[in-house]
Structure formats: C-alpha cells, structure tokens
Amino acid sequence: MRILVTGGAGFIGSHTVVELQQAGYDVVVLDNLCNASEKVIPRVEAITGKKVPFYKADILDREALEEIFSKEQIDAVIHFAGLKAVGESVQKPWEYYENNIAGTLTLVDVMRKHGVKSIIFSSSATVYGNPAFVPITEECPKGQCTNLSLIHI
C-alpha cells in the first residue's frame, strides 16, 4: 500500500512516516515546508534505510496534487498538512480557512478523481477548549471555539 502523508516533514508527520515505513508501507511525503524543514527527509531515510519520495508542494495546488497522485499511484492519505497556531489563526483567519478548509477540500477532490477512498485526518485538541476531563477522549464535550478549532471540528 502506498500512502501519501501530507505535512510529512513536520514533527508528527515525520514520525508517522518512520512508523509507516518500518511497518512495511510505501510512503510519499508532501509538505510546503512552512512549518518544517526539508532536512527531515534524509533523517527519516537514515532511520528507516528507505528512500522517501518528497514533494515540496501545497495542498491548495491542485495541479501538483494531480501530478503526485498520477505519478505515485497513491492508495491512501494521512492528512497532517495545515496551519496550526491558535494565536495566528485569530490574526489571520482567512489564511487559516483557505489553507485548512479549501486545501483539504482540494485534496479530497483529487483523491476522489483518482479513486482514493481512504483518509486519516489529524484534527486538533483545540476543539475541546478547556477539557472537562483528562486524558481527553473523543467522548469529551467540545469546548469554546477558536478559529483553529472550528476548522478541525
């Protein structure tokens, strides 16, 4: 199975890539590097001993996504790409909505066109506001909403 990890050069994404490769999956990474460094890719390759196809691209770039899905024959997606700073999401709400919502919709549309039906979407603990209990589970009631948490609900 060939899995595309969006945001795969970020902290959580790169660790997920390592785990997937060590579990025997073929992994392709897409990241625009706005919150990550390309230096992560050789480090992942050193840990796993496997080459990682890397694309510096944005999830808003439909043409780039089409090319990646066509070239790499993607079977599933793990979606970590997105802007994530709560404070900045208040200062730049449009940028966050465009990137996190429109970008995700673009990704899902390209998946649909290529017959890819499996996606794991990484949400955010911000949807719980001040949690009613810890550790947080999916049953925890949703809390006060910020721009960032609204995007992830």
PLM regions and their residue ranges:
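N-terminal Rossmann-like NAD(P)+-binding domain of SDR-like oxidoreductases, especially those catalyzing
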Residues: 1-151
